[in-house]
Amino acid sequence: IHSSGTSIRFEDVFTADHDSFLESMADADRSVMDYMGRENIVYINVANRLSVDCDCDAHPHDPEMGDIGIFASVDPVALDQACVDAVYASEDDGKAALIERIESRNGIHTVEAAHSLGLGSRRYELRCIDSHKN
């Protein structure tokens, strides 16, 4: 994924341009969907203690934001769009760091690429099932 399919050599892992890397994540999702069958997958995002760094980072930056919820969908594009929108809509002051990281790294591009591949819709409807929030 990190080399956008251009190499399997470790030395080349981080040589792809950033947008190609983001597009390869959408391609990887498509591969899983094709293999497993879209009807057999439910996606869950746990948006708690949000850091600007990827969860794959061995030494991530401390969390900038608190919990904004657990999101689930059978549509991975709608799910990720809802999570990004929740960051922007949050009243948490720490959101500024996440928004800066999203915008400076074109982070929404994976959602755009997945939508372009037909993996889902960027439109969604949120339904709160937490009785404490109603």
PLM segments and residue spans:
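Extended, low-polarity segments enriched in aliphatic/aromatic residues
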Residues: 1-134
